[in-house]
């Protein structure tokens, strides 16, 4: 069984496209063929009471009940980079974003490269870590990083930066959501956690804007990566592996460029396959992912989860033409070679 997930492909009808959605408008003969020959229906990937997000949708698709396992994306991303959380640790996704004139301009810091972001994250960990010993910044991928607050409280409201472009970032700062009287053992209050995170956010702006990397960016007329934005926090989740939930899955893999998906794979007991050139953007190695999925099945995997982030990133950037391209790339450069290969096998392969 192979699941191919084009993250963020779904969208609203677009007037410029004659009232069609991007999936309706895009040229996708292989997706169309699979839909025609297979079974189609509506799948609720975000249960009632949960905000739409990749951590919810992808783990739901794998069969996890969010009421039992949901802890936000931070702990999943921690697992993917090998950070071992303690039970009292609060793990948050930490974007490096761009703000101008008090507003969020981009959620990705001007498309940061991982190597550049690593310099900034290590700098923040060194400088802010001196004043805040219970805080750790850990490098992830591109603009997506990890912030760990030892003894932090998860009952806080953090706004995902990609949901608030051109909004005043001061009005979106972290807020507590539990009364002061409700204290969890081993954790500081949610008010203290919110105050700590807001202080880190505010202090990061001056530190980042005065870093040589951003000074050079500003000289070149490029957007600075000038503010941290923590969100998606939670504690270490308690998840069964897919093999424990579904005994027919003896061996499985996940293929993704995104830490979050790799983290889900870690807790699901899946092998993470790293594909060279897989970027999470439109220039990702579609062919390499297809080849890796085919090889995993040949090697005896019962289940392969192939995740492609490119369409989601194009959507967040508001780039309609690029998003159309990513959907068509997925069809022609990833789905096509997989379908063409497995259709020659004697053993049937289910493709979702």
What are these regions (language model features)?
Residues 326-352:
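Metal-dependent active-site segment of extracytoplasmic phospho-/sulfohydrolases and closely related
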């Amino acid at each position: 069984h192979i699941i191919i997930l084009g993250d963020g492909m779904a969208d609203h009808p677009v007037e410029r496209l004659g009232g069609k959605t991007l999936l309706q408008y895009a040229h996708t003969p292989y997706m169309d063929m699979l839909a025609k020959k297979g079974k189609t229906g509506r799948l609720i990937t975000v249960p009632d009471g949960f905000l739409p997000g990749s951590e919810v949708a992808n783990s739901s698709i794998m069969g996890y009940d969010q009421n039992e396992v949901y802890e936000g994306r931070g702990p999943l991303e921690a697992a993917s980079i090998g950070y071992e959380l303690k039970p009292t640790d609060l793990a948050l996704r930490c974007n490096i974003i761009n703000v101008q004139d008090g507003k969020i301009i981009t959620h990705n810091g001007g498309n940061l490269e991982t190597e550049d972001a690593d310099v900034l994250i290590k700098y923040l960990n060194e400088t802010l870590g001196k004043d805040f010993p219970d805080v750790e910044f850990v490098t992830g991928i591109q603009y997506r990083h990890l912030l760990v607050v030892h003894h932090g409280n998860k009952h806080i409201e953090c706004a995902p930066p990609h949901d608030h472009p051109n909004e005043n970032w001061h009005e979106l700062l972290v807020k507590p959501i539990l009364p002061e009287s409700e204290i969890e053992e081993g954790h500081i209050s949610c008010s203290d956690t919110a105050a700590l995170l807001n202080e880190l956010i505010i202090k990061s702006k001056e530190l980042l804007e005065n870093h040589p990397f951003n000074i050079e960016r500003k000289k070149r007329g490029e957007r600075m990566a000038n503010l941290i934005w923590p969100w998606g926090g939670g504690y270490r989740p308690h998840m069964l592996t897919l093999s424990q939930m579904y005994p027919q899955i003896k061996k499985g893999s996940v293929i993704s460029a995104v830490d979050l998906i790799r983290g889900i794979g870690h807790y699901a007991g899946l092998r993470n396959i790293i594909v060279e050139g897989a970027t999470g953007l439109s220039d990702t190695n579609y062919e390499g992912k297809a080849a890796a999925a085919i090889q995993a099945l040949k090697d005896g995997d019962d289940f392969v989860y192939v995740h492609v982030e490119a369409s989601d990133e194009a959507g967040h950037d508001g780039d309609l033409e690029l998003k159309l391209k990513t959907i068509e790339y997925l069809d022609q450069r990833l789905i096509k070679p997989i379908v063409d290969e497995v259709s020659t096998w004697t053993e049937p392969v289910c493709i979702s």
